């Protein structure tokens, strides 16, 4: 068994059954590591539910977000497939999957911007600086990394409206194959310049409480309200 170190704030997000989740933290806090954990949890349990992973820019996506997430996947034995050097690999990136992968649920002319897993799971990837390119996609879960500078309207129009594929459910406080439909989105980002994060999550209402907690390595701010988790 591979032992994984997870912080209390990360555990709160991992265990959240709110549809809209925010992990707001500084550099080195494990934001993208958290994304790696959550993404593979969903990939493994719901192989027929498509996911979406994005960052604010393409360079952020390729050089930071996916790099860190794939590092996590590798740490638990989930490697990229290569016919010659890693035939036991479990995913391919931007290419047609090999015949040993499940693809009966695929219907793509081109696999650019797609991560395909051996169990059939598909993850769309992209950047939010070309948000309109995600129009028409449909997925069941989403992870948005470092999108603090992304405009709120782009997220509402091109992401939240696409977050509607069925297949993930919550029952008795656990992920399930039946029960209440669940389409979670996770924002993993550092403090925002755009006001939409403060407004969506009502952070201005908790300024004093936040200030009293965030400057210690032993405490953190946590709140659930409506359909949101911070």
Regions found by a protein language model. Give the residues of each.
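Phosphate/NTP-binding elements of NTP-utilizing enzymes
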Residues: 1-230
């Amino acid at each position: 068994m591979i032992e994984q170190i997870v912080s209390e704030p990360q555990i709160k997000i991992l265990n959240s059954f709110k549809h809209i989740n925010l992990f707001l933290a500084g550099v080195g806090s494990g934001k993208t590591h958290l994304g790696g954990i959550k993404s593979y949890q969903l990939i493994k349990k719901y192989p027929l539910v498509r996911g979406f992973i994005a960052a604010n820019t393409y360079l952020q996506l390729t050089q930071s977000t996916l790099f860190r997430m794939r590092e996590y996947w590798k740490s638990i034995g989930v490697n990229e497939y290569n016919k010659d050097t890693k035939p036991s690999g479990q995913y391919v990136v931007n290419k047609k999957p090999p015949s040993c992968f499940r693809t009966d649920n695929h219907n793509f002319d081109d696999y650019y911007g797609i991560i395909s897993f051996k169990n059939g799971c598909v993850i769309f990837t992209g950047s939010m600086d070309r948000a309109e390119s995600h129009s028409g996609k449909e997925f069941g879960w989403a992870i948005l990394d470092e999108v603090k500078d992304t405009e709120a309207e782009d997220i509402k129009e091109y992401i939240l409206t696409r977050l509607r594929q069925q297949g993930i459910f919550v029952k008795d406080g656990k992920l399930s194959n039946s029960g209440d439909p669940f389409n979670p989105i996770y924002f993993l980002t550092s403090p925002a310049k755009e006001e939409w994060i403060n407004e969506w999550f009502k952070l201005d209402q908790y300024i004093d409480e936040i200030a009293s907690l965030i400057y210690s390595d032993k405490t953190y701010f946590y709140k659930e309200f409506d359909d949101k988790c911070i």
